[in-house]
Curated annotation (Swiss-Prot):
This is UPF0102 protein Meso_4010. NCBIfam families: PRK12497.1-5 (NF009151). PANTHER family: UPF0102 PROTEIN YRAN. Belongs to the UPF0102 family. One of its GO terms (molecular function) is nucleic acid binding. InterPro entries: Restrct_endonuc-II-like, tRNA_endonuc-like_dom_sf, UPF0102_YraN-like.
Length: 124
């Protein structure tokens, strides 16, 4: 891998990490408790898992220039991977039977507060 490609990947990683931190901060201010950051499974990765009461939000974080681009960035393939990872996470929870699950998006936009889109799959 060339030095330029490595630098580009490092920048993207840092940008993603900052975006996830900002998204988690915004969700905390809305009363959510962050249960996991970058939850990895063999089936996929979840950026954030947040909980408020009996509601668990599986949160995809996207840093894009516009909200529309952020929403479009969650492809059908990504949805399937996120669903599979969420099912695995949920199956490991002792109180899973009483939890409601929702898939959300937090769009990190330039020079703006993060936008929280609840129930991203239905919002399309």
């Amino acid at each position: 891998m060339g030095a330029e490609a490595r630098l580009s990947r490092q920048r993207a990683y840092r940008k993603g990490h900052r975006g996830e931190w900002l998204a988690a901060f915004a969700l905390r201010l809305k009363g959510y408790r962050i249960l996991a950051h970058r939850f990895k499974t063999p089936l996929g990765e979840i950026d954030l898992i947040a909980r408020r009461g009996d509601l668990v939000a599986i949160v995809e974080v996207k840093a894009r220039p516009t909200l529309g681009e952020a929403m479009e960035a969650v492809s059908f393939t990504a949805q399937r991977r996120i669903d599979a990872a969420a099912d695995l996470w949920l199956s490991r929870q002792p109180d899973y039977a009483r939890l409601s699950l929702r898939y959300d998006l937090v769009a990190v936009l330039p020079r703006r507060w993060p936008v929280h889109v609840e129930n991203i799959y239905a919002a399309r």
